[in-house]
From Swiss-Prot:
Name of protein: Ubiquitin carboxyl-terminal hydrolase CYLD
Pfam families tied to this protein: CAP_GLY (PF01302), CYLD_phos_site (PF16607), UCH (PF00443)
Catalytic activity: Thiol-dependent hydrolysis of ester, thioester, amide, peptide and isopeptide bonds formed by the C-terminal Gly of ubiquitin (a 76-residue protein attached to proteins as an intracellular targeting signal)
Molecular function (Gene Ontology), one example: cysteine-type deubiquitinase activity
Membrane topology: Peripheral membrane protein
PROSITE patterns reported in the protein's UniProt record: CAP_GLY_1 (PS00845), CAP_GLY_2 (PS50245), USP_1 (PS00972), USP_3 (PS50235)
Amino acid sequence: MSSGLWNQEKVTSPYWEERLFYLLLQECSVTDKQTQKLLRVPKGSIGQYIQDRSVGHSRVPSAKGKKNQIGLKILEQPHAVLFVDEKDVVEINEKFTELLLAITNCEERLSLFRNRIRLSKGLQVDVGSPVRVQLRSGEEKFPGVVRFRGPLLAERTVSGIFFGVELLEEGRGQGFTDGVYQGKQLFQCDEDCGVFVALDKLELIEDDDNGLESDFAGPGDTVQVEPPPLEINSRVSLKVGESTESGTVIFCDVLPGKESLGYFVGVDMDNPIGNWDGRFDGVQLCSFASVESTVLLHINDIIPDSVTQERRPPKLAFMSRGVGDKGSSSHNKPKVTGSTSDPGSRNRSELFYTLNGSSVDSQQQSKSKNPWYIDEVAEDPAKSLTEMSSDFGHSSPPPQPPSMNSLSSENRFHSLPFSLTKMPNTNGSMAHSPLSLSVQSVMGELNSTPVQESPPMPSSSGNAHGLEVGSLAEVKENPPFYGVIRWIGQPPGLSDVLAGLELEDECAGCTDGTFRGTRYFTCALKKALFVKLKSCRPDSRFASLQPVSNQIERCNSLAFGGYLSEVVEENTPPKMEKEGLEIMIGKKKGIQGHYNSCYLDSTLFCLFAFSSALDTVLLRPKEKNDVEYYSETQELLRTEIVNPLRIYGYVCATKIMKLRKILEKVEAASGFTSEEKDPEEFLNILFHDILRVEPLLKIRSAGQKVQDCNFYQIFMEKNEKVGVPTIQQLLEWSFINSNLKFAEAPSCLIIQMPRFGKDFKLFKKIFPSLELNITDLLEDTPRQCRICGGLAMYECRECYDDPDISAGKIKQFCKTCSTQVHLHPRRLNHTYHPVSLPKDLPDWDWRHGCIPCQKMELFAVLCIETSHYVAFVKYGKDDSAWLFFDSMADRDGGQNGFNIPQVTPCPEVGEYLKMSLEDLHSLDSRRIQGCARRLLCDAYMCMYQSPTMSLYK
């Protein structure tokens, strides 16, 4: 997508700003001229139209033959000014802009925009509306009533519209607010009975339907309507000046909001004369329109090629995109009486054919751009769909079917209007590309009908051949169709279970995952085929691979091909700040989880995504005492996990399973490929038994021998006086109570929180100290006197809890201060010990107050909730520079589907880390917004690094 970034400064006087808004249909990657860094503007972003003041306060069309460009100020990135091609954006009205802007995920925003009916219904949702709310993905929807409608924050030119909903019935207690947002009471309800959501999480409950998701009439509906008076693909003429021009009908329907005006017709002209891009009032009505050759006119201005053209017999209303809105379906479309026919079952092959969501009888097919559905394949695989036409599979058009009167009622709606052919390559050869396993949630262009999302329905577990979602399948044709099953279910109005396949090759007339106006999955355009499940067979080309024996081997199957990640030989340091952010955030980012791997995925992400503290582990040459698979493990970690993660932001489950298999080679280690494990088990096996890493920590207890370990588990009794402890306090308490000291300053310190198992936590919240001062925990290190700041000579453990002297701090004193402190009657019996100091300590350092501090920085936090590990990592210096990672954030398919990892920014964490401990203690955990609750309440391991020490280790 061509675009230009003019500046990153505040847009002020050089531009007029008009209240016109556009949605980006393509992603922009543009260069910031100041920093020379790429700025990513994803598709689905919303921009406000701007005009150079020197041009004037209006839009000026480009010269003929040149591409029109539009200047936009991106609302989510208000300092960026883009100039984009007009074809890469779609204009949206301000009311739609407000509804869409509240949806922060640009892909979900674009998906909702394409569902025109649902978006329009969003305008009807107001205070008092009964709704259902989707609180969490994959869970049931809760009933509620809208109590607030409006912006939460009004800091932009236009603000997103949010809905404050009071949850009812089983939803009570499932919310997170009582109507208060950032200290402001926006509505009132009981505690934890309210939520603030955008339209994408909302569904309007109406008396006459099942909500926003049921706005399209399906084939099971008994309502009958009169079809549009002009056939799609019929030939027509129109007067242009003194001449007559011809074209093909690509749209015939009423316009939304203008139903009283009657039908309008979109005509694809034979000659390049046109003025319509397929949109009306910001809504896409026709995907095949081209502004250079398409016109939109009232039906009275259109001359059919045959003025006496017979009207089609009435049939079930498979409503087109213009008919889908209930409001429009009743205008100018009288009901037609008559019996409806049930397609029934047939012994021979038949096809449904749908265009723009409507069932259409056979007709001349000039442009193969239509979704289609194979109703049935003959039980004998040798019998082909070609029974319907001897020319099937060739480019010539099929013979004209018999008239409607000659068809039986069961066959009336089943015809073959085009030749099914695979799309040729540019060189004329047939395309045989590898399986397309795309799982992107939206298409890059607005080239599909705005469709309703698929209604929830139970998926079939498979058929007699053991096929299920994710299986490689074929439809026995000549030539066969190969693909991956993406969906199994029973659409409304059909008695058979269908399979939705994503085909290997493009096929004329296939969709991008929609069937009869409903989206069941998403793939590239012209690759979605819907066929009866019983007509599918396992892919004969890979018979030896089916079925996959178990979950351990599944991630090495061909079905995982679309999720593979790269191999990178070159050593790669972590990318930080904005550069790292651009690489890492989004869906299918991070490390893909599979089969109880979250403990390992999250630990690796914490250790390597944005830290190089342990990079020496990846570089040490093999020694004679190393295990035989040392090099294999190290190379796998370096080239297939760490380097790809840092460059591309993604590692697939196949690579992680290879590592899990290696872990099981260790004697006394088992279950790493299948069972739930804890991070400490993984670290001990990897670091101690396989890589033989020099222990990260060397700790001495009361003059005993130094003990080596790779992480430190905090053991202590609960202090009832402390509400929210910091990591600094916990570590010092634990060391004081156990009389421990670090024998060496660590370069990487992994601290395990005081909790027992996955469930019992000693503290409800723990404050993750961003900086850890370990000076007082080190042996042979100069330390400051707690009283005067001079060189400390003695340490007293019994003074630790004394409230009169820096309560809760380790106490060390110079000789003079120690004498004075222990003259107090309460401290006369204290036993204090000399502080161990370096033998060659320069005398002038401490006399001039130059006693250095050893500090470590927090770089990651590993969390667990209900046996599932997730990670928080810090990608920059700012307190809000936090990312949240979940290796199993989403799912593609059912039991044998695939997990989709996701990395999301969570800047709200920074705000909570600025709060005082008292405020955090008094804050109800359920009121903590976003991901921050998991960081503060579910911490399992906190990881610190020393920027200076890591240079030497």
